[in-house]
From Swiss-Prot:
Associates mainly with 70S ribosomes. GO terms for biological process: negative regulation of translational elongation. The gene is yfiA. During stationary phase, prevents 70S dimer formation, probably in order to regulate translation efficiency during transition between the exponential and the stationary phases. In addition, during environmental stress such as cold shock or excessive cell density at stationary phase, stabilizes the 70S ribosome against dissociation, inhibits translation initiation and increase translation accuracy. When normal growth conditions are restored, is quickly released from the ribosome. NCBIfam families: yfiA (TIGR00741). Belongs to the HPF/YfiA ribosome-associated protein family. YfiA subfamily. This is Ribosome-associated factor Y. It comes from the Bacteria. Gene3D superfamilies: Ribosome hibernation promotion factor-like. One of its GO terms (cellular component) is cytosolic small ribosomal subunit. It comes from Haemophilus influenzae (strain ATCC 51907 / DSM 11121 / KW20 / Rd). One of its GO terms (molecular function) is ribosomal small subunit binding. Keywords: Stress response, Translation regulation. It holds the Pfam family Ribosomal_S30AE. Residues 85-107 are annotated as: Disordered.
Length: 107
């Protein structure tokens, strides 16, 4: 898996790259294929902005966060991506439950 990182108005240090790779590896526990993850790191007037876009077989994941600390923004983006991935993984299960309830009310 190739991790694409784009930065605007700042340099990407090895520590930032390593932190991004660690946080992306945490998404691996969902056992789904992550297709072309792309992160955009920006320096904005009130701190740092991180945007992420990752494709999966279930759909696309998009998240962004702004913070005064780059690592904090990266962590927030990872948490948002994890929530979205959890939602996508369990979407079919929740729809199945709705059908069972619908059938029981019709009878």
């Amino acid at each position: 898996m190739t991790l694409n990182i784009t930065s605007k108005q700042m340099d990407i240090t090895p520590a930032i790259r390593e932190h991004l790779e660690e946080r992306l590896a945490k998404l691996g526990k969902w056992q789904t294929q992550l297709i072309s993850p792309h992160f955009v790191l920006n320096k904005v007037p009130n701190g740092f902005s991180v945007e992420a876009s990752i494709g999966t077989p279930l759909g696309n994941l998009l998240a962004s966060a702004t913070s005064d600390d780059m690592y904090k923004a990266i962590n927030e983006v990872e948490e948002k991506l994890e929530r979205q991935l959890n939602k996508l993984q369990h979407k079919s299960e929740s729809r199945r439950a709705d059908e069972r309830l619908k059938d029981s009310f019709e009878n």
